[in-house]
A protein has these predicted regions:
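Active-site mouth of glycoside hydrolases
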Residues: 1-176
Length: 177
């Protein structure tokens, strides 16, 4: 969504791969992620007196749709790089989980391809994210410049959802403690 193209990220990546090939497409998106927050950005933030940066990320940075038990190292490398800049420039990081399996809202900017927030209909999707939120804090538990976590960006519930958001937050925060 950061490219300003109103298309779910997964569809955009598939289209790039079809046009440019899998290797070139993967390289483009790797380069994009690496250039999204640069050291120059952190220096500018520090020079202007800003001490907190909220960085969105897609669950696919850490999880593979074909094997959700697998943790992709690229997500941890991305956070490691950001936290290195945070320590150097004394800026706090607030990672923002911007998309989850099935989509937490119906919008394209959450990488939702169906327009239905299916995350709330399938416990397996919620379990995958709860598991991810177990792993990320375990790795960064002692990181002084990690301020906290935006556990789920812009959740949207249908009227019949009856407490699902509250239940999810209770389950996910329990694994953080």
């Amino acid at each position: 969504f950061m490219l300003g193209i109103p298309t779910p990220e997964k569809q955009m990546k598939e289209a790039f791969s079809e046009v440019f090939g899998p290797e070139q497409s993967a390289q483009f998106f790797d380069d994009f992620v690496c250039s999204f927050c640069t050291e120059e950005d952190f220096k500018l933030l520090k020079d202007t007196g800003i001490n907190l940066i909220r960085v969105p990320f897609n669950y696919r940075l850490f999880l593979d749709d074909q094997n959700m038990e697998l943790r992709k190292e690229e997500g941890f490398r991305y956070f490691d790089r950001l936290l290195g800049f945070c320590r150097k420039y004394e800026i706090y990081l607030l990672p923002d989980l911007h998309s989850v399996p099935g989509g937490q809202n119906p919008d394209w900017h959450s990488d939702n391809q169906t327009g239905t927030p299916a995350f709330w209909h399938y416990d397996v999707f919620q379990q995958q994210i709860i598991s991810l939120w177990r792993d990320i804090p375990a790795r960064y538990r002692d990181e002084p410049y990690l301020l906290g976590y935006d556990l789920l960006n812009e959740p949207f519930l249908m009227p019949a959802a009856d407490g699902k958001l509250q239940q999810f937050y209770e389950r996910v925060t329990a694994c953080l403690l």
